[in-house]
Regions:
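Soluble catalytic domains of enzymes that build or remodel membrane lipids, polysaccharides, and related
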Residues: 22-27, 31-267
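Non-catalytic terminal accessory segments
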Residues: 1-21
């Protein structure tokens, strides 16, 4: 797995106050031994931790969608914490997400913040905009021998809520082990179970890359050493994006906003 960052602005100093114009586009090359040659170069744009609410409004979301669509992805993966407030108050700010364009669609999983504000109403709202939620389930991307499997699981903390809870066994049950398996899971630490279920690569968010130095020390403790970037757990690769929004203060220090472009490569 290799990565390269294309900054959308000059990087002469650490960034503090942020806006929708300050995202970095990070390209990550992920080689999968089971990926069919026909899918070499398949692109996934990963968006995470948008945290719609407060100063992250409809205009901010629309700009993120526009930046995503300009990358012309084959698939969009939204790895949780898209919202930070009640549906009744914020639904209109989420509307631009319905404009995401990708040949194979936009898939999402829950993050911990969806549960703070009512996960079921938000899942229904975002599904109505065209997002497909993977709740301990998977989808086949492509056709026949020219395909891979995309799985998604509920957030690590969701077992506290009725009808929810991470279930990797269910998400991977009955799958063809000869097919590549990409997993969407909000929290990086979920990889420690995913590695035992045949996952080839897990895409996660949650950490914000620490968001504001030196908070990253606390984040690394909570996620058992996982903060941002690439990791390897046995045969399972992990990529943790810094996310395209922020939580709390409109501030990021040494952890810029990120839109991730994952390029799948056949070995």
């Amino acid at each position: 797995m290799t990565s390269a960052t294309n900054s959308m602005q000059a990087r002469t100093a650490p960034k503090t106050l942020v806006s929708s114009k300050t995202h970095e586009i990070t390209e990550v090359q992920v080689t999968l031994a089971k990926l069919p040659r026909a899918l070499d170069g398949f692109s996934i744009v990963q968006l995470s931790d948008l945290h719609i609410g407060g100063t992250i409004d409809r205009a901010f979301v629309a700009d993120v969608v526009d930046q995503t669509n300009r990358l012309a992805p084959d698939l969009v993966a939204l790895t949780g914490d898209l919202v930070d407030g009640r549906r009744a108050d914020l639904a209109h700010h989420a509307v631009p997400l319905g404009g995401l364009r990708a040949r194979h669609g936009a898939f999402a999983v829950t993050g911990n913040h969806e549960y703070y504000w009512g996960a079921d109403p938000w899942i229904a709202q975002l599904t109505s905009l065209g997002l497909r939620y993977l709740r301990n389930e998977r989808a086949t991307i492509g056709e026949g021998d020219e395909s891979f499997e995309l799985a998604g699981v509920d957030d690590h903390e969701s077992h506290r809520y009725a009808g929810h809870g991470e279930d990797l066994a269910r998400a991977t049950a009955g799958r063809d082990p000869a097919r590549a398996l990409v997993l969407l899971a909000h929290q990086p630490r979920q990889v420690r179970r995913a590695r035992h279920h045949g996952v080839d690569v897990q895409l996660s968010g949650h950490t914000h890359g620490g968001q504001i130095w030196p908070w990253h020390y606390a984040v690394k403790i909570q996620q058992r050493g996982l903060l941002a970037g690439r990791y390897q757990f046995g045969d399972t690769q992990l990529y943790v994006t810094r996310g395209c929004g922020y939580w709390g203060p409109r501030l990021r220090v040494l952890a810029p906003l990120e839109i991730t472009r994952v390029i799948l490569r056949a070995s």
